[in-house]
Amino acid sequence: MIQEYQLRVLPEIAANEQRLKEYLSEEKGLNLRNINATRILKRSIDARQRTIFVNLKIRAYINEMPEEDEYEHTVYNSVEGKPQVIVVGAGPGGLFAALRLIELGLRPVIVERGKDVRERKKDLAQISREHTVNPESNYSFGEGGAGAYSDGKLYTRSKKRGNVDKILNVFCQHGASAAILADAHPHIGTDKLPRVIENMRNTIIECGGEVHFQTRMDALIIENNEIKGIETNTGKTFLGWLAANGVTIEAKGIAVGVRLEHPAMLIDQIQYHNKNGRGKYLPAAEYSFVTQAEGRGVYSFCMCPGGFIVPAASGPEQVVVNGMSPSNRGSRWSNSGMVVEIQPEDFISGELKMESGELAAQQNAQLLAINPLLSNSQLSTLKTQLTPLHFQEELERQCWLQGGRRQTAPAQRMLDFTRKKLSFDLPESSYRPGLISSPLHFWMPDFISKRLSLGFQQFGRTSHGFLTNEAVMIGVETRTSSPVRIVRDKETLQHVTVRGLFPCGEGAGYAGGIVSAGVDGERCAEAVANYINQQ
């Protein structure tokens, strides 16, 4: 007999299967000897009160043995000789699109500007060691995309539960722990995810697909408003090419701020209401904050308990930071993005203007180099479309200047920031390239710094001990999502003016994390299959 139960137990019971069996036997009147195994289907922590509980949904196998695998297998057959589909980018959107195309009997050919996930690791080490950034292989570009070496966090707010479960099961099929199927906030870990990504690539190749690394798509070949192919490794900038050649794009809202790092013990003490921290049976504590400050959202983003802050620049003259956590979340620090919502209209008001005249001239020159026939009116329109991107680039450059023109990051103690004081020293940090004390409140746009300060003060009121000089703000967090969207039809998922082009995933402006990008990749693969079947 197989029975499912909802349980509310202490952490030490949830962490030990034998104790869980004993609890089940006592609470449900079962014979302990007849409970052969238990499987946790859902798990979440209730830390609202001083006594912490773990909510479980479990499956008990009574006088039966459990099935061997805890996840559902997807069958991938050979697609040798099948119609070919070019997939640009080997991030989660591209990888899941490719796997879904194979399911649908189509042959994916992936082109990826960066290196494979193993070779990429060497370039990441150079950023911290030598302060040099390879524009083609870094924390943003390469196999696995930005998520491969950031955190491996698989939480999404997507309401398409079936699609989310499919994504998690595919990860398990390729080597991820089945625990991700149960956890409320599933997490693979940046130490485990590269192997999973490598296995996904191997499945694609074994089925007859192709994966080409160090192959950057720079332009599209378009005839009569229909895509015919791509140009690679030409040196052009792709978004600039799209804008200059009339392929419809649009500015979208972004969120910009800092990485905030606390001692992990302090966050554990706050969240678990215990001066001794999390103890033996609880994971490093998470938090989530959101508030409104002068009409714009201020919120935590991609919180990494027991994690590290890493340099995420993708080119020269940039300092960008991101967070990551290993699977055990065992670091001495916990960090999170703390960002302010920015809408496209905020740039029009002029309050967010950072752009220098020299930079504006360079941007116009780049567009004219791609398309010399652009009029002043067209240049003005393109500038509006690309303004969030250019703002992001200029803020990252300012951060590089403030950091001493290296990957050293400008930083300020949290309480000092709210009091507009320069920090005379900084706490120890997980950020390996190093920190330099800097008045973030002074050089960051007032639109951002003012709202961050108000947000921090609000978070400090609701979570005693959170607003503290033990915490350090590290600049800047700018890559929460793409600042530009390649516009597609809501029903067909095809570009609004170019037939056969299906913008997909985070880079195209349609996702905000690993799982949402994977879900979007599968949806776009299905849309491509429908398009091909109608030809």
Task: Label every PLM stretch briefly.
Residues 2-54, 58-149, 153, 157-170, ...:
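Residues forming the flavin
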